Design a protein with these regions (language model features):
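Alpha-helical DNA-contacting segments of helix-turn-helix folds
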Residues: 49, 56-63
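Short secondary-structure transition hinges
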Residues: 93-132, 143, 152
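Amphipathic C-terminal alpha-helical segment
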Residues: 93-97, 133, 137, 154-176
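Conserved small/polar residues in nucleotide/adenosyl-binding loops
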Residues: 179-181
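Short hydrophobic/aromatic patch on the recognition helix
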Residues: 39-49
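Short, charged helix-capping/linker segments at alpha-helix termini
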Residues: 27-28, 144, 148
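Basic, helix-initiating cap at the start of DNA-binding domains
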Residues: 1-24, 28-40, 53-54
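Hydrophobic alpha-helical connector segments
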Residues: 58, 72-99, 150-157
């Protein structure tokens, strides 16, 4: 139970932070704002994060929350390609409506410069578990070329999505809503 509560507290802090970053901008958001919005304490904030900058690596957590929300809506009768297209589209709709291009650019640059953990590549994320499940089901139905490794399909799809995000940032956010598989 304590682990679940700590995950909820950390999650509330992350969700509140990204909401405020989008509404007020990163520089316009203070730790006090985040603590107030999350309904937590400064002690809780600093228990999980060294400071506001530490939240930059948590966007993958926000993305994973979106994937968790999408899981019950996935139609098991749809093919893998259609399901991948759906989750891709839904994530990008969420990004356009709640993640500023400046923040996404910062996240991608911190991931490029990170010497330690690269959150976007963490194979234990909900994202990768969901991709593996979709690809496995597609392979079982014969939707992919025989001999094509499921892990390679997952890796290629994840790489393609990161490339889209990077290119969207490079282009100033002009076209994300036009991207569909």
């Amino acid at each position: 139970m304590a682990k679940r509560n700590s995950r909820n507290t950390r999650g509330r802090i992350i969700s509140a932070a990204w909401k405020l970053f989008y509404e007020q901008g990163y520089d316009g958001t203070t730790v006090e704002d985040i603590v107030f919005e999350s309904g937590t304490s400064k002690g809780s904030f600093y228990h999980y994060f060294d400071g506001k900058d530490a939240l930059m690596g948590t966007l993958a957590y926000v993305f994973d929350e979106k994937y968790e929300d999408l899981m019950p809506t996935l139609d098991p009768e749809k093919g893998a390609i259609e399901t991948l297209a759906y989750i891709n589209h839904e994530l990008y709709v969420m990004i356009e409506s709640s993640v500023s291009i400046d923040l996404l650019t910062r996240l991608l640059s911190t991931q490029l410069l990170a010497r330690g953990e690269k959150h976007l590549l963490d194979r234990s994320r909900v994202y990768f578990r969901l991709l593996k499940k979709i690809v496995r089901q597609g392979a079982e139905r014969g939707e992919f070329r025989p001999g094509l490794a499921q892990e390679e399909i997952v890796r290629a799809f994840a790489m393609w999505e990161r490339a889209q995000l990077y290119d969207w940032c490079l282009c100033g956010g002009d076209y994300l809503s036009l991207i569909h598989i």
